[in-house]
């Protein structure tokens, strides 16, 4: 049972109480202080000090200072008044127990409120940090969008500048052609003047040299007229025999029918033009050429301006949808932009147009299979991707890069099967 401490001293003012409590040699670390508005307890085994205060105090602003084997309490009163005693008198044990329990409950409620306030503050801090992160990410996204927009505007300006340059070059060529025509016309006029002058000189000379007489004058006059008029050109015909195109295929592996069909399809594709497009009226002649648009798209692809390249290929396909290389090149752009389903569609369309399979279109078919297989693999459809890579290897078995990629896909498929 702890020993009650009674040798304490206290002083007061109207606003505060100063309590001095000796520790009796007990270590400060073993001292436990519990203070509420009506109750003060100091436990420093084997001693115990307990005070049921005369009036309520402000326990939050009250202080305790330990030094020189003594605890000095500064207890601030809630109401300014002088106390008759430090502890209330005439309190029985039941009343003391109620005061203790009430003080403990108040302390627990206060601790709970402090914990909840701390948790709420932590949530607010997390919410603020999340909002800051979202704001930073939004700024980064906007920055990236602005960079893309600036690149698009830059590419558009470059394209417009290139068009303007082409237009001026065409105008310059036209002016040069007109100047050459004017020079040729001047030369022709001068030649005609010289011919007229020579013919007049001959007429005068013949009149002076010829004997006088009607018959002789008529003979020479008719002769001069015949000399001055050139004879009509003779008509002839030129026969042209075109050399037939021969494919470099061995006779035992000859695919003459398929090769002829492929040539026929290529010729039809070059002739197939769709001119019923509203935008054509705003374009120059070279911009209406699918081949020119294809070359322009290739240049934009080389500069990593994939969106502008797709626009060029789109217009070329609208003009001529029978050219397989347009779909093949557009599939490469979609791969770079991660438009995987569109890349698969364009590769499949290119393979449809690259029929029948001949040596002349083998390289294009191999690229179409590789690009479609790459799109399948990025969609995690590794079995379909491997099928396309194996089809590409059948076309070009010596391609080391395709062999390595196909082996990697096989390893991925085998690893997936083992996990499952």
From Swiss-Prot:
An annotated Gene Ontology molecular function: nuclear estrogen receptor binding
Main function: Involved in neuronal migration during development of the cerebral neocortex. May regulate the stability and proteasomal degradation of the estrogen receptors that play an important role in neuronal differentiation, survival and plasticity. Axonemal dynein assembly factor required for ciliary motility.
TPR repeats: 290-323, 324-357, 366-399
Protein name: Dynein axonemal assembly factor 4
GO biological process, one term: epithelial cilium movement involved in extracellular fluid movement
Residues annotated as transmembrane: none
Gene name for this UniProt entry: DNAAF4
Residue ranges of the region described as Mediates interaction with ESR1 and STUB1: 7-103
Keyword annotations: Cell projection, Cytoplasm, Neurogenesis, Nucleus, Repeat, TPR repeat
Quaternary structure, from the entry: Interacts with ZMYND10. Interacts with STUB1. Interacts with ESR1 and ESR2. Interacts with DNAAF2. Interacts with CCT3, CCT4, CCT5 and CCT8. Interacts with DNAAF6/PIH1D3.
Keyword presence, Nucleus: yes
Domain CS span(s) in chain numbering: 3-87
Localization: Nucleus; Cytoplasm; Cell projection, Neuron projection; Dynein axonemal particle
Assigned GO CC terms: cytoplasm; dynein axonemal particle; extracellular region; neuron projection; nucleus
S-S bridge residues: none
Native organism taxonomy: Eukaryota, Metazoa, Chordata, Craniata, Vertebrata
